[in-house]
A protein has these predicted regions:
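PRPP-associated nucleotide enzymes
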Residues: 1-298
């Protein structure tokens, strides 16, 4: 809000004794352009329900337009039916946001870009790349090389390599279950390189740590991971504590680090970059009906 020179709207959120959520927007929103900021993380079910109720309250308060700002779009990994009798929860979340009364969605680095097609309202999809690339350029690495920790992230990794003017390598992996990952080969030469692994998110750090170990075995000089979202779990912290391959983990503040996890005692350097100005500029442009996509022309 400091970037926009505006104040945060006043809203009261409380719980009834039975656990139900009650929301009251204190400020008058009639005829206003309302932006509701709420990442669906940490306690995704609670956060999602809060968001839906806030949107409904703004709609019933006669807001002119309601934009749901989701720095982190929870449930994004459930984006397709890959087994019998499973839901496509990412689509369900989209339906709920629209049904509640959202006129527009602003989010960042979706796990699957096709989620934008789940909506029948405009979706502005931001990327953390400008923030990450600025930081990485300032490091002046001797022999940088961008690496995708899996084949699915190759497109995003290629974009980073173009922005940084580096080569590209890919780690091919075989997933065993939902959290266990067996990285088995590297496509490209990483020997002597300052590796930058690019990923949209990590929770248990299985892919990240397995890929880092393999890259170190292949002769990488240093290994950094640039990850937009980090809804870290206990398992993720355990893996990072045991890891001896990663030099630095660079993340953004789209997801707050859990206070109950000892993230300040990790052997790997943890750097948190702010995307507040990027989100603020996108909000300003949406409010003024200006282009958002021009933020990402390099």
């Amino acid at each position: 809000m400091a970037y926009l020179g505006s104040r945060l709207g006043d809203i009261n959120i409380r719980r009834f004794p039975d656990g139900e959520i009650h929301v009251k927007i204190v400020d008058n929103v009639r005829g206003r352009d309302v932006f509701i900021v709420q990442p669906i993380c940490t306690q995704p079910n609670e956060m999602l329900m809060e968001l839906l109720i806030m949107i409904d309250a703004a709609r019933r308060g006669s807001a002119a337009r309601i934009t749901a700002v989701l720095p982190y779009y929870g449930y994004a990994r459930q984006d397709r039916k890959d087994q019998p009798r499973v839901p496509i929860t990412a689509k369900l979340v989209a339906n709920l946001l629209v049904a509640a009364g959202a006129n527009r969605v602003l989010t960042m680095d979706l796990h699957a870009q096709q989620i934008q097609g789940f909506f029948d309202i405009p979706v502005d999809h931001l990327h953390a790349a400008p923030v990450m690339v600025k930081y990485l350029r300032e490091m002046e690495l001797k022999k940088p090389l961008v690496v995708s920790p899996d084949t699915g992230g190759a497109k995003a990794a290629y974009a980073y390599s173009q922005m940084l003017g580096t080569g590209l390598a890919i780690v091919a992996k075989q997933r065993m279950g939902d959290a266990e990952v067996d990285a088995f080969s590297v496509v490209g030469d990483v020997e002597g390189c300052d590796v930058i692994m690019v990923d949209d998110m990590t929770t248990t750090c299985g892919t990240l740590c397995a890929a880092a170990k393999l890259l170190k075995e292949k002769g990488a000089s240093s290994i950094r991971a640039a990850v937009t979202h980090i809804p870290l779990t206990e398992k993720g912290v355990e893996r990072l504590q045991a890891d001896t391959s990663l030099t630095e983990l660079v993340v953004t503040d789209t997801v707050p680090l859990r206070a109950d996890l000892p993230t300040n005692k990790l052997p790997v350097k943890l750097t948190v970059l702010s995307v507040a100005e990027l989100l603020g500029e996108a909000i300003r442009r949406i409010h003024q009906d200006q282009s958002v996509s021009s933020l990402f022309r390099y």
